A protein has these predicted regions:
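Aromatic-anchored, charged helix-turn/loop surface patch used as a conserved interaction hotspot
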Residues: 4, 8-13, 25-27, 32-112, ...
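C-terminal non-catalytic interaction appendages of large macromolecular assemblies
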Residues: 101-172
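Surface-exposed, charge/polar-rich loops and edge strands
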Residues: 19
Length: 172
């Protein structure tokens, strides 16, 4: 993950490996998204870059989309190990207050995460930055009512929100 913000001019001038190293992290452990978006340079706006990355995700095979979903960590779940989270995920989960859960709340979240994962075969994904611990718990419970196809679509939409925020943070 880049520490200092980059300009679009800098990104547009980069070769593919440098471009991927600078923005590939925006889509959790899925640099292939940035690799595909690089083809659409030059980007006039951050929205152009985001749109290119979304095109790559939405045109990917169902298997690649599922791999992207599965690359995401559980939100405050028992399976979460802080050392395994990316810096961005750690910061986003902390911002939603997930690092401040009581033992009871953490156990409840872990049970919901496990049920979700058992039901759908992938982790529950929600843009933590736009939520707090309570709204995350409520969304998790409500989304257990969805079909697997609905949840794949919702998860990709949440990944899109996460990617947009991360790109906005990284690019001036």
């Amino acid at each position: 993950m880049s520490v200092e913000r980059l300009s679009l001019a800098q990104l547009n001038a980069m070769d593919r490996p440098d471009f991927v190293s600078q923005v590939g992290w925006a889509y959790e452990h899925s640099a292939w998204v940035a690799e595909g978006a690089w083809e659409d340079r030059p980007f006039r706006t951050i929205d152009d870059l985001y749109t290119a990355m979304e095109r790559v995700v939405r045109s990917a095979t169902p298997q690649k989309q599922l791999a992207l979903i599965q690359a995401h960590p559980d939100l405050a779940g028992r399976l979460r190990s802080m050392s395994e989270l990316t810096v961005a995920s750690r910061r986003e989960q902390a911002g939603a207050g997930l690092d401040q859960l009581t033992a009871t709340e953490a156990e409840q979240m872990a049970r919901h995460n496990e049920r979700y994962r058992e039901q759908f075969g992938f982790p529950f994904i929600l843009c933590a930055r736009l939520n707090n611990a309570e709204s995350i718990r409520e969304a998790l419970e409500k989304r257990l009512e969805n079909s697997r196809a609905q949840e794949i679509d919702v998860a990709l939409g949440e990944i899109s929100k996460i990617g947009r925020w991360r790109l906005a943070d990284a690019i001036s």
